[in-house]
Swiss-Prot record:
Lineage top rank: taxon: Bacteria
Protein name in UniProt: N-(5'-phosphoribosyl)anthranilate isomerase
Protein family per UniProt: Belongs to the TrpF family.
HAMAP family listed in its UniProt record: PRAI
UniProt keyword annotation of Amino-acid biosynthesis present: yes
GO BP annotations listed: L-tryptophan biosynthetic process
Swiss-Prot/TrEMBL catalytic activity: N-(5-phospho-beta-D-ribosyl)anthranilate = 1-(2-carboxyphenylamino)-1-deoxy-D-ribulose 5-phosphate
Recorded metabolic or biological pathway in which this protein acts: Amino-acid biosynthesis; L-tryptophan biosynthesis; L-tryptophan from chorismate: step 3/5
Amino acid sequence: MKVKICGITHPDDAREAAKAGADYIGMIFAKDSRRCVSEEKAKYIVEAIQEGNSEPVGVFPEHSVEEILAITEATGITSIQLSGEDILFKFSQLREHFSIFYVVSVYSNGQPSAALPPMNDAVTVVYDHIGGERGSPFDWKAFSPFQHNNWMLGGGVNLWNIKEGISLLNPRGIDVSSGVERPGILRKDIFLMQALINSAKELSSSTL
């Protein structure tokens, strides 16, 4: 079970997430996000996890290929998360350079908002509650993932519902942001991260 801690805004949070066993550390570059980071801050975050095994992921919802290449080169980011328009063109231009995550937005009723574009299992599909930062899950019981082996469950996952999500859907990974944050601020809670990552790894082992 892979775990991605997304929306990291501080190097200390990234370092603690890596120590706790996070496989991926996500940084958001969407300017309309409260968790948006600058290139300078992203570079410090990447440096904070260099000694561990966590992989830095840049979240680029509407950026051009040229912008993505420039930001990743400046920061040291090695994986990217894509969404938005011209996705097949971006895949063709970027797949040789990066590991790629692709976001599929899901409505509250558990229905994906769009069909899955053609892609191979090297791309990790992330299912996220439409709206992105609502902090609540879509209807997992009504949800059925596309026929794509490599996928993560996101959108409202937290320590209190992770067991239900894994039991119902058996995803290959978990993507969490607000579910491990301190109340009222955009910083991650060390103990919540540790507990959620441990739960994800233990629960995935028990379902094998």
